[in-house]
Regions:
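A general sequence property marking short-to-moderate contiguous segments
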Residues: 131-152
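Bacterial lipoprotein signal-peptidase II cleavage site
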Residues: 17-27
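Extracellular and analogous surface-interaction loops
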Residues: 160-172, 208-213
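Beta-strand-rich ligand-recognition modules
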Residues: 186-233
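Accessory carbohydrate-binding/adhesion or oligomerization-edge regions at the termini
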Residues: 27-138, 220-250
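Bacterial N-terminal signal peptides
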Residues: 3-13
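Extracellular beta-rich ligand/substrate-recognition surface
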Residues: 147-158, 195-200
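Aromatic-lined ligand-binding clefts that engage carbohydrates, nucleic acids, or primary amines
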Residues: 166, 171-185, 218
Length: 250
């Protein structure tokens, strides 16, 4: 009897061991938290394209400064002229004078044109800097064919540009007469701002400037309210005489 009981106990122990081996106790495993999905990365917006001035050709020259009489010398009569642009409002508040119509091309102070540079206006139309020269001393805008100015057209403005090519550094006087007002830049520096309404006379303003050796960019913006529309500009010494060694390119 004792032998039977011992055999039964032994069988129970063996069976328990087999059950434990078949079903091992699971270990405690820490749950790994799910990672939040990464936020979608939005591509950086492409920088707005800055309109580039379309260049159709090189500048022309050199040309001599013009002379009318012995005491009327040094006139710049070869220009690149672009227009017309609007100059709305009533004097003395015509707003075109203070509007930078070259803002999409670097701005008036930084702008550099060449023969054929295109400017897209706010209304979508395109105007160009094109060469013009006169056999006189005055730039009369109504005579500039490519501007297509209608008879007695009012409240407009134009830009004119040229290069003064100097054979050395020189102190000069740039003398301006205008109908009506103007802004003048030389080598991208604002030299004068005359928001006036007047008839033109020679040498209404005298600006003492220093030309560098080589080409010096001159840009002038001339506005019109009513009546005649013109300007004259000459480059002379303090005695009003032409200075040798200066030519003009446009």
């Amino acid at each position: 009897m004792m032998l039977v009981l011992c055999l039964a106990a032994l069988c129970a122990v063996i069976a328990g061991c087999q059950e434990e081996a078949a079903s091992p106790k699971a270990k405690d495993v820490k749950a790994t938290p799910e990672k939040e999905p990464a936020a979608a990365v939005k591509p950086a917006p492409a920088p707005a394209e800055k309109p580039a001035a379309a260049v159709a050709g090189p500048i022309l020259g050199p040309f001599k400064l013009a002379k009318n009489w012995a005491d009327e010398q040094g006139f710049v009569v070869n220009w690149l002229i672009c227009g017309v642009f609007p100059n709305p409002g009533e004097r003395p508040d015509n707003t075109g004078f203070g509007t930078d119509y070259l803002k999409n091309y670097g701005g008036e102070a930084a702008f550099t044109p060449t023969n054929g540079t295109e400017i897209k206006k706010d209304d979508g139309s395109v105007v160009k800097f094109l060469p013009y020269s006169t056999t006189g001393t005055d730039i009369i805008f109504g005579d500039v064919a490519h501007l297509k100015i209608e008879s007695n057209q009012e409240k407009i403005l134009c830009y004119c540009a040229c290069w003064l090519d100097s054979d050395a550094d020189k102190d000069v006087e740039v003398r301006v007469g205008s109908d009506d007002g103007y802004k003048l830049w030389i080598n991208h520096q604002l030299i004068s701002e005359m928001h006036v309404y007047r008839a033109m006379e020679m040498d209404q303003e005298t600006h003492k400037v220093k030309l560098n050796k080589g080409k010096n960019l001159l840009l002038i913006k001339v506005d019109q309210d009513t009546g005649e529309y013109q300007f004259m500009l000459r480059v002379v010494g303090s005695d009003g005489k032409e200075i040798p060694g200066i030519t003009v390119w446009n």
